Amino acid sequence: MAVPKKKTSKSRRNMRRSHLALGKVNVIVDSQTGEYKLPHHVSLVDGTYNNRQVVTKKIETEEEVA
């Protein structure tokens, strides 16, 4: 079994972990709904992209829910 010969210093350990940091998410405010959304993605609220309706929401009836 492999065992380290010397203790890894805090500096070396932290430098190794520097690539694990999470980047900040770029969100924009949707001009039509005012909700936050990711750029170049379909709006989850109303299904629009580039001011065009691309996704229609399915209306659930009481029979489907039960």
Curated annotation (Swiss-Prot):
Transmembrane segments: none annotated. InterPro entries: Ribosomal_bL32, Ribosomal_bL32_bact, Ribosomal_zn-bd. It comes from the Bacteria. Keywords: Ribonucleoprotein, Ribosomal protein. GO terms for biological process: translation. GO terms for cellular component: large ribosomal subunit. GO terms for molecular function: structural constituent of ribosome. NCBIfam families: rpmF_bact. Belongs to the bacterial ribosomal protein bL32 family. HAMAP family: Ribosomal_bL32. This is Large ribosomal subunit protein bL32.
